[in-house]
Amino acid sequence: MTFTQQVKKELSILPINVKTSKSELSAIFRLNGIYHLGTAVGNTLEVQTQNPASARRTYQLLSQTYEADIQTNIERGGSAKIFGLHRYGVITMKQADQILADIQLDPFSSDRRVPEVFLNSQAKQQAFLRAAFLSTGSVNAPNSKNYHLEISAADEDLIEQIFSIMNNRNFNLGAKIADRRNKLIVYLKTGERISDFLSIIQATSSMLHFEDARIMSDMRNSANRLANADNANVTRMAEAAERQYEAMDFLRQQNRLDNLPEKLKIVADLRLKNPEASLSDLAGMIEGQELTKSGINHRMRKLMQIVKELNHKKV
């Protein structure tokens, strides 16, 4: 089961709230509804989806809100079987026109915006977003490389409405709109915002799972960054120690060690005897003196400058 399927399954079993059920149905029929005119049983209203959880929620909303005469069907194989998924249909047999009038949806109008009466409270807005996600939403798994949640729609006014609600003062999700393959999407790209959205639509278990996975992923990423930084530091230290050893070896070959001031000669001798030691290690090897890494580094810079000047004269 994908994470999208997990979220939709959780949403499909939430208790139906009759005060907000029409807000859900308003979104579902505007996004996935099909109006059939003049069938053998009269006008019918159908919702088609490839997600069984979405079909289940639609069935429950219709049966509990309208006690409607509902028929369900599943199309298997052929063109209906896309990416291994079947197409589920939920059809109202006798009350299509009543339901459309009730949710103020004119099937012959190009206006797909949801009326304000279905969005005039935070609870109704949450129900609307929940139904929109159930209808056309998807979300990447929390352990995927990139966080991404989206809701799609063919109608520009409807996508603008979804966008506006996601970004209003109640939710402030920072959603954005994009045009993708002849459809519009509203999307979120940060883990924190996706977690907030899942909480808003009451997918609480999925939100907690998402947060757990996100925290673990962030911890692994932090550990990897620290490990990479440590490895880089070790590499830099090893390269610096090698350069210092070569410089001190040059002084030895040029018979310059005995001419150095005693403090510098001690450090040069220690580096020659301990080519891979860190500056802190070298500081701890000097007997009778309390010398810090900074002190060793200061003396080493003087030695490197001497080598540089000798090389310059040699050229």
From Swiss-Prot:
InterPro entries: Homing_endonucl, Sporu_reg_WhiA_N_dom, Sporulation_regulator_WhiA, Sporulation_regulator_WhiA_C, WhiA_LAGLIDADG_dom. The keyword Cell cycle applies. Keywords: Cell cycle, Cell division, DNA-binding. GO terms for molecular function: DNA binding. GO terms for biological process: cell division; regulation of sporulation. SUPFAM superfamilies: Homing endonucleases. Belongs to the WhiA family. Involved in cell division and chromosome segregation. This is Probable cell division protein WhiA. It comes from Oenococcus oeni (strain ATCC BAA-331 / PSU-1).
